[in-house]
């Protein structure tokens, strides 16, 4: 499956940026779609529309954690170090392609109103968010190809 196309479709059909990326990978993470949508919901708009870390980036990291993360019982087997290395590499790639991982910088200082605006067709023409979602999903697919998931 091309997760980047699917993530873009999810975003264009009303999912938030973070939800679109996280939901696009439910086939890989095994996380229930309804639960995934709830987990990702606070991260849209740069975390609750505060315009901090881009929601697509947050969604990307949630997928990364679901696939390669560690839990509180894990011994130090290098997973934490590898995970943080991958987080930083993804951030660098996203910055290189999109200019920033910070929502307010990507959107050129929009208001942080907690009330999301309606999303008519004009919304999608003015915002780069769909491109951020597609980029985040593509970068994730590249990482997954480099680090196949252990069953």
Each model region followed by its residue ranges:
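Conserved alpha-helical segments that form or flank metal/cofactor-binding pockets of metalloenzymes
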Residues: 49-60
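Short cysteine clusters
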Residues: 17, 54, 103
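C-terminal binding/interaction regions
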Residues: 83-151
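A short glycine/serine-rich beta->alpha loop
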Residues: 5-12, 43-51, 121-126
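Phosphate-handling active-site elements
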Residues: 28-38, 66-86, 148
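Active-site-proximal helix-loop elements at catalytic-domain edges
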Residues: 1-29
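DPxDG-like acidic metal-binding loop motif
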Residues: 59-67
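Acidic-glycine-rich active-site phosphate/pyrophosphate-binding loop
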Residues: 24-42, 106-113
């Amino acid at each position: 499956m091309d997760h980047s196309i699917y993530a873009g479709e999810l975003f264009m059909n009303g999912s938030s940026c973070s939800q679109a990326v996280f939901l696009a990978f439910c086939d890989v993470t095994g996380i229930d779609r309804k639960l995934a949508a709830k987990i990702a919901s606070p991260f849209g708009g740069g975390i609750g529309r505060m315009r901090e870390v881009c929601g697509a980036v947050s969604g990307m990291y949630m997928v990364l954690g679901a696939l390669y993360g560690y839990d509180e019982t894990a011994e130090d087997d290098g997973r934490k170090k590898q995970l943080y290395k991958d987080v930083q590499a993804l951030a660098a790639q996203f910055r290189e392609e999109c200019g920033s991982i910070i929502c307010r910088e990507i959107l050129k200082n929009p208001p942080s109103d907690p009330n999301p605006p309606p999303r008519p067709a004009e919304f999608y023409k003015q915002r780069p968010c769909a491109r951020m979602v597609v980029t985040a999903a593509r970068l994730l697919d590249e990482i997954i190809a480099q680090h196949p998931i252990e069953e």
